[in-house]
Amino acid sequence: MPIFKENMDIHKRLLYHAFVFPFLFLFIFWLVFLVERVLYTDFTVFGIFPLATKGLLGIITMPFIHADSTHLLANSVTFLVLSVLLFSNYRHIALKVFILIWLFSGVILWVIGRPSWHIGASGVIYGMAFFLFCSGLLRKKIPLVATSLVVVFLYGGMVWYMFPLGIDNHISWEGHLS
């Protein structure tokens, strides 16, 4: 029995760590949103404005800025699910992968985006979905392939928002693509 209890403690600790980072980021998402609302200000200027120096800071700050509560809630749920899957299945490389996705999605958006402000965590979300799907298939380990299938089942429809066809002009399809 002690070995079983010890294994349970290890699994609880690993699961706890898989949730800490995602919840910390979600807390920051919501805190920024609440500060923006309480101060009656607009943080859109902390987004990315492609090919302009004024938009470079957005590579770091864009995922924290959301247009409204609907945008924030949609990103929050998806971000939580995908980041927990990332940090639970790839705990040794998850932080590195997360940071690379964060930075590269911002840089790519800065290069390819329309000349307007782009905000939200969609680039990071799409990047995590892409990583979880591809990595699971390429590594050919059953739990990771299962994760790939979960991602496709839950978020396979996201692919249609990577193209400008039929999307509202205020939605950054470039942010999804990057």
What does each model-identified segment do?
Residues 2-178:
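A detector for small-residue-rich transmembrane helices and their helix-helix packing motifs
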